[in-house]
Amino acid sequence: MALSYLRPWVSLLLADMALLGLLQGSLGNLLPQGLPGLWIEGTLRLGVLWGLLKVGELLGLVGTLLPLLCLATPLFFSLRALVGGTASTSVVRVASASWGWLLAGYGAVALSWAVWAVLSPAGVQEKEPGQENRTLMKRLLKLSRPDLPFLIAAFFFLVVAVWGETLIPRYSGRVIDILGGDFDPDAFASAIFFMCLFSVGSSFSAGCRGGSFLFTMSRINLRIREQLFSSLLRQDLGFFQETKTGELNSRLSSDTSLMSRWLPFNANILLRSLVKVVGLYFFMLQVSPRLTFLSLLDLPLTIAAEKVYNPRHQAVLKEIQDAVAKAGQVVREAVGGLQTVRSFGAEEQEVSHYKEALERCRQLWWRRDLEKDVYLVIRRVMALGMQVLILNCGVQQILAGEVTRGGLLSFLLYQEEVGQYVRNLVYMYGDMLSNVGAAEKVFSYLDRKPNLPQPGILAPPWLEGRVEFQDVSFSYPRRPEKPVLQGLTFTLHPGTVTALVGPNGSGKSTVAALLQNLYQPTGGQLLLDGEPLTEYDHHYLHRQVVLVGQEPVLFSGSVKDNIAYGLRDCEDAQVMAAAQAACADDFIGEMTNGINTEIGEKGGQLAVGQKQRLAIARALVRNPRVLILDEATSALDAQCEQALQNWRSQGDRTMLVIAHRLHTVQNADQVLVLKQGRLVEHDQLRDGQDVYAHLVQQRLEA
């Protein structure tokens, strides 16, 4: 472990010694004298060492600190020359200088490594996210391709706005020079006019630019959310058992928002800053090349500060994402099960859980804000030091007659702006990595292949409804070692009612889930009219095989929306016919708007029996050939049960009833008893076998 960690550094030292030996000989004689030769030497060292380490796959943190090692000496002598005001300052080459200069370079690298090791979060040094991030960025760009016209318009307005903003300080300097010298009314009026013109034009263009980027952001956000939601609904049930609801909600809300702002928001700031920096440096060079080169020294300082700050910032942002998702999960569980929470008097316990989750969020927010404040203080101190240095050199140039007072004012305004935009450019790198991190999670869901067979195409015009379980076994994906069903073999015949009974955990609901094609058997075959269930078209199958659960799930919307759920072009007459068959027409008729009455979230405005009737009507409106009732009549009165019995007698439908009551079993034509996933009994009703008699006796005693 230790040897593999030291290998890049040892390789760097040996390669650098060999290269410096070459530069000390005939190769070094080819280099020019002074600062140009020093910079060529540093650049040559950087390129060769970078290439060798890249070939050996040894870059990592060494590659991050390599520019400091190779360019620290040229930067030092360049700074001394710029501050002193002369480029003829004697310089030394690292290859031919004393060992002190080389040790100083490696000392700076060692100090930087120590700072990096202390301030960077664990694991950052070992990460190599470049290639992966580039792939994700390409996918984000591809996702934004439909909005290319709006992005082009936004970029046009961006260039116009930035150019206008860049010219304003130039004319401000002219005004100062006019007021400080011989006053020329025409020149003064011209300068003021152009200042106003560029101010108004840049403001208008900036508004158009921002509007175009925001419009693009909203379009991308909608597109990502639609694709993600569509992908989630196609996943297998095992995925939802393994993934928390709070995590899915977080991906659909916060992560998709981060993704949608990646291109519009970052492109807005990135391109604006880039164009602004280029334009500002152009005008700064016209004022004073010496001051311009001096201001360039702020770049490595800014990059170094961001290099330390960004990994910490990204790490804490990821922790905040997880903490917020957990806090949201507590709220959703408590509110979703409020009746249970209240019935057990657990309000204070849930509040305590939420306070703990919020406290974790607060600690992370405080840590994020503290680190950001410390970083901003360091940046402002560095900016102030650079400004003082430029002022000192600027005064020397004014005294030498090289720069006017107005020119120095323009330069200081430019320099303040360019520092801000350079920081924006460097900051955008970290922000883009943050958003790409969110995109990685979303893309993992978009790319996930559901553990489901390929959809079938069978959709016969008529279905008999004969169901055959042939030696069917099943285990849930999360517990493959624990079989739920073992070797089930039975047939459900059209025109018969089969009761499936057994103790809790025997596998009754799993049989219903397999019959709906929600899971696939791990062994054996499940046939419908002699064809494997997976061969049928998805929508066709779920029109022909329908389940009504003991606790029906309803959705916010009207009565009609819930009965006709999943159906297209379902007429009101069909809805009312199904409601009448389910004995739901009486309470629907008493509602204010009939079948168009809103029933609230999860059908909260209905009683339990009314919910079951709507769920039965939702199944009957499809006119299924196979109907599964998971004790779905437990909350119905005798009249409604009789109406359902009448519907059963119409047509040769196949019916499977998961029974928990003696009354339901007595009305069945066939009884199947499950125990520990095995079919214990498969005889006709009222044969009086021991297992079934024992079950009936237990029910009567209960």
From Swiss-Prot:
The chain crosses the membrane at residues 7-27, 57-77, 99-119, 148-168, 187-207, 266-286, 293-313, 374-394, 408-428. Its EC number is 7.4.2.14. Gene3D superfamilies: ABC transporter type 1, transmembrane domain, P-loop containing nucleotide triphosphate hydrolases. Residues 1-6, 78-98, 169-186, 287-292, 395-407 are lumenal. Keywords: Adaptive immunity, ATP-binding, Endoplasmic reticulum, Immunity, Magnesium, Membrane, Metal-binding, Nucleotide-binding, Peptide transport, Protein transport, Translocase, Transmembrane, Transmembrane helix, Transport. One of its GO terms (biological process) is T cell mediated cytotoxicity. It catalyses: a peptide antigen(in) + ATP + H2O = a peptide antigen(out) + ADP + phosphate + H(+). CDD domains: ABC_6TM_TAP2. It is a multi-pass membrane protein. ATP binds at residues 502-509. PROSITE patterns: ABC_TM1F (PS50929), ABC_TRANSPORTER_1 (PS00211), ABC_TRANSPORTER_2 (PS50893). Residues 300-388, 413-432 are annotated as: Part of the peptide-binding site. GO terms for molecular function: ABC-type peptide antigen transporter activity; ATP binding; ATP hydrolysis activity; metal ion binding; MHC class Ib protein binding; peptide antigen binding; TAP1 binding; tapasin binding. It holds the Pfam family ABC_membrane. Residues 28-56, 120-147, 208-265, 314-373, 429-702 are cytoplasmic. Heterodimer of TAP1 and TAP2 (TAP1-TAP2). A component of the peptide loading complex (PLC), interacts via TAPBP with MHCI heterodimer; this interaction mediates peptide-MHCI assembly. The peptide-binding site is shared between the cytoplasmic loops of TAP1 and TAP2. PANTHER family: ATP-DEPENDENT PERMEASE MDL1, MITOCHONDRIAL (PTHR43394), TRANSPORTER 2, ATP BINDING CASSETTE SUBFAMILY B (PTHR43394:SF14). This is Antigen peptide transporter 2. It comes from Mus musculus (Mouse).
